[in-house]
């Protein structure tokens, strides 16, 4: 049985990973660690695990020693050195943070304020968006799990950019997320009286997911792609919906667009291209690893509008990481991820 460990197990992403992994039939949990709750039993931190596990938060070295696959669910800047140790021990590392998502060190320094601490390791890392990078993921031992916003946007735009059907510049990405995307640490923006009955953008023009979106979309299009990305906080726990505006190079109808998308994703079980006339929504993907995509035309402005919906904690984080693990280990891609969204 494959042993799996989590470094940073008590943040929202880490604990969501653990919740899903406990229902995975092909693995068992080797060990978990948490700086904030070192030495404490998980059941005393999160009561929803009562009766399911007696795991105790231990130190990072024990997690690496007892695990074959290690998920690092840490703030940016903390994973590189740990990943090096994991790889040196011939283990698999799936990093949930931003440390390995960008290939350009100058770009990383501009957005995150640091240089790469392990530049050679970046050459070994693979961007873990399975629907677009599956073959590389299969043979990788270091995965950069994509950001939540980039996942929703990249899946939505990939078919059009891959087929050179839209202008690569001037793409507008208007995204809304539940507050779990901000993590478990307290902040004024996610304080209940501030967020409840409110809806507002944040980090306008300076969100750190912007360079990730542009780099991956540029790779898909084989030309430089630029976007205007504006995130917003919704007064809900989980979910992302992205509304994306782009300009076709030539006039194209909805039926043609639908055929392109259904063909592009025909073998991808987690991406659902909705029938024409339907609109993607958070409710229908909540608590699942699915991405729902719908598209629409603004005939007056000759504009394609794409709607993409995911659960930010699952397809945007923990579920996608498990999907990557399944691919690397040769498991069924949906192992542990056969999740159906609740109807209400």
Curated annotation (Swiss-Prot):
PANTHER family: N-ACETYL-GAMMA-GLUTAMYL-PHOSPHATE REDUCTASE, CHLOROPLASTIC-RELATED, N-ACETYL-GAMMA-GLUTAMYL-PHOSPHATE REDUCTASE, CHLOROPLASTIC-RELATED-RELATED. PROSITE patterns: ARGC (PS01224). Keywords: Amino-acid biosynthesis, Arginine biosynthesis, Cytoplasm, NADP, Oxidoreductase. The active site is at residue 148. GO terms for biological process: L-arginine biosynthetic process. Its main location: cytoplasm. This is N-acetyl-gamma-glutamyl-phosphate reductase. NCBIfam families: argC. It comes from the Bacteria. The lineage of its organism: Bacteria, Bacillati, Bacillota, Clostridia, Eubacteriales. HAMAP family: ArgC_type1. Belongs to the NAGSA dehydrogenase family. Type 1 subfamily. It catalyses: N-acetyl-L-glutamate 5-semialdehyde + phosphate + NADP(+) = N-acetyl-L-glutamyl 5-phosphate + NADPH + H(+).
């Amino acid at each position: 049985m494959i042993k799996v460990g989590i470094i940073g197990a008590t943040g929202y992403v880490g604990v969501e990973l653990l919740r899903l992994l406990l229902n995975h039939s092909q693995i068992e949990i080797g060990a978990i660690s948490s700086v904030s709750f070192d030495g404490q039993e998980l059941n005393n931190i999160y009561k929803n695990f009562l009766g399911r596990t007696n795991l105790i938060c231990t130190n990072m070295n024990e997690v690496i020693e007892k695990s074959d696959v290690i998920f690092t669910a840490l703030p940016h800047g903390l994973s590189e050195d740990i990943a090096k140790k994991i790889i040196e021990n011939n283990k698999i590392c799936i990093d949930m943070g931003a440390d390995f998502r960008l290939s350009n060190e100058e770009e990383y320094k501009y957005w995150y304020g640091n240089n790469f601490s392990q530049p050679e390791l970046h050459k070994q890392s693979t961007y873990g968006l399975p629907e677009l990078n599956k073959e590389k993921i299969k043979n990788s031992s270091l995965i950069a799990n994509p950001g939540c916003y980039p996942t929703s946007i990249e899946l939505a735009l990939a078919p059009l950019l891959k087929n050179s059907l839209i202008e690569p510049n001037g793409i507008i990405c208007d995204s809304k997320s539940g507050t779990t995307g901000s993590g478990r640490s307290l902040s004024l923006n996610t304080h209940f009286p501030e967020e409840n009955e409110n809806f507002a953008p944040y980090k306008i023009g300076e969100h750190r997911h912007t360079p990730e979106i542009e780099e991956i979309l540029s790779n898909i299009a084989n030309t430089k792609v630029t976007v205007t990305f504006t995130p917003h906080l919704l007064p809900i726990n989980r979910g992302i919906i992205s509304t994306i505006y782009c300009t076709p190079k030539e006039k194209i109808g909805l039926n043609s667009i639908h055929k392109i998308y259904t063909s592009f994703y025909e073998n991808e079980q987690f991406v659902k291209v909705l029938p024409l006339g339907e609109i993607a929504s958070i409710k229908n993907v909540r608590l699942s690893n699915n991405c729902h995509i719908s598209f629409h035309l603004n005939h007056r402005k000759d504009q394609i509008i794409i709607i993409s919906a995911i659960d930010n904690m699952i397809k945007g984080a923990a579920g996608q990481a498990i999907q990557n693990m399944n691919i690397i280990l040769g498991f069924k891609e949906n192992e542990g991820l056969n999740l159906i969204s609740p109807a209400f």
